[in-house]
């Protein structure tokens, strides 16, 4: 229903939204998230006086015709605004590479070619040019009028900028007409240049945030941390968050959300971007489209004091889907997005995720004082009502300090990503963790890790020591903390902070005088993308494995601090049980390399070389061939394991993709071979009573003794039942068994590589703690802010450009065009760097040297080589080898002696005939 301005006759002609053009609207009732791709926005040329999304539907049917402006939208408000467009086409879809004029899709006159077009400059270079004062326009630089802005307390630059008319008009009338005392919440974006450390971002120092300025209680602070994700991944997370906020606002019978003001005013979304340099500039266009960012307003410094973070604030009802579809409210139906209070913090320099969390908790958290903080990584899509489920966990349990939901792998449409065995294996790993591990730890009250990609904390629970210990890993505090900071840490502590979320979990549960516990909330689900390539997978797991191992040891060594907490005796009893469980798991992890090798060899020996008494043949190649095959498999296994150390100690995974891929495949084949042998053992045990030397005719005691004998067959049967059987039973109990059929085989194929490749690489690179930052050369494109004094030198002011609304609107068109251009993933180059080439040659050289020597040693000394046609025994071969070696050394020594004698004789003879 179109909004009618006050005093307007309701019988007047309403804007026409029923055309087939670019409509900014939410999904139709009943539509699913995956169906958004069918909602075209750039499909056809606009028609009618209000055919474009940026035409103001709240203006009268006609408006005075202004002088022609290359970027003004107001001409399209006049129904007879004709013009000649040399690029005019009908019914075509704009693509970033076509020659058609994209302005036609918006009903805008033809204009001068922009120097910032994507075809002429890269998105990064075009972004740099747009940061110049007045440089956002497409027709070249021009002079604008200026206004004087006072600095808060003489040092804090905080300015309100008008948002484009299209964004203002997208806000529903019931919100725009209900402004609080002339609030500029929906009409202006607020920009603050923070020139301080996050700890100094306080009201006392002149900094403030809009929700606090409006005296609103913040119940839920939703934080999205970002590094360099593309606009599709960012939109997936942001649109999912806005849909979840809509779920909360639409609650009808809530005892909390419907009291004390609108529900949307109790929720704040904060996006924290880790540096201008790594940031994807197309993502900034998406944020500008919904109103939370504008080009050309950021300041590099204020009076020479460098800006640390650029903070934008706006309340919007717009959203962009991962398919680059722009969604806006059309009515008061349940699918309409409510207003969402947003903050966008763009850090000037890349200073790591832990510093982003310091901005979130120490800067924004202390001003907003939220009850619950939800942490998301860009790329994680929260499921329907997932954020509500997380919040309800805190609302219904006053002692809950932290919680996490179920994270599952993004499988794509029709689960097509499961074709990749690596994705399927990770899907199974995530599922089993959510079915077996997380519920167990939640029952104890201490979840060892709440994943930073999808977790929540009660803000007052983590205040104090938990956050203090957590932020010791922030390198920007190294000088301030001294020996307690990064510079004073040993390599063990630095690795510990690779899994800093584990540190926060332990500190929260062990907080002195408190009884906070952690929980897993299954009803809350989040979807995340997982590595699809071997190199990316190895690099990711290095940080996870090293960080979790160090943090696990930290929690065990500091378990005594639990006695200072306020937990009751029952909770402490279960925490002690969990500690013993963790100790046992740590020991198993430490010896996993040898355990896997021994398991593999024992199973192959049991099946391939059965005892003489039971009369079984070797499986699967017969009694004579199977031992030979098994011997080859063992040597290949050991050789590949040795290769992992060579690769891990000298190469980057991206520089050795083929070697690592080969290792995964060969280890997978060996694993399948061993699994087939193990299944054969089980089948033989239950089909032939004499097959594996079980005693079945002398009572239960003798049967159990033979079952658990050193032959190992009974133990293997129990192990198979306790793993495979347990997986199936637990999955069906949780009514989520599909991964057992779609992903379990792939997991079995990759499982041995988890131990033999990932663990070896992680421990071999224990020294790599990935600290350090990258400078931001992109910040050089930002202008500086210099103050002048007024009122006799009492007031510090700066001069700021005051753009006309028409120019703001026209520049916004170009922004939306860039934001809604279909995303084309960049082609990743697999070319090796020069350093990678040198390292690869070194690896091949060392590998050839080691394996050729090992092969010689095995051929000479191994008794097993008799099976390959060697007629003599290992003792005879060793004796003959030493004879050959001694004769060879003697021959070399003789040649060297002959050479020395020849040189001596020649030199003496030449002395007699040399000319003086």
From Swiss-Prot:
One BP annotation, GO:
cell wall organization
UniProt membrane topology term: Multi-pass membrane protein
Q: Does the keyword Transferase apply?
A: yes
GO CC, sorted alphabetically, is: cell septum; plasma membrane
Glycan attachment points: 18, 546
Describe the disruption phenotype.
Exhibits hyperbranching and a lower level of conidiation. Leads to sensitivity to the chitin-binding reagent Calcofluor white (CFW).
Region Disordered: start and end of each range?
Answer: 1-84, 114-141
The GO molecular function terms of this record are: chitin synthase activity
PANTHER family for the chain: CHITIN SYNTHASE, CHITIN SYNTHASE B
Q: Which family does the entry's similarity section mention?
A: Belongs to the chitin synthase family. Class III subfamily.
Protein name, please? Chitin synthase B
- Species, as recorded: Aspergillus oryzae (strain ATCC 42149 / RIB 40) (Yellow koji mold)
Tell me the name of the encoding gene: chsB
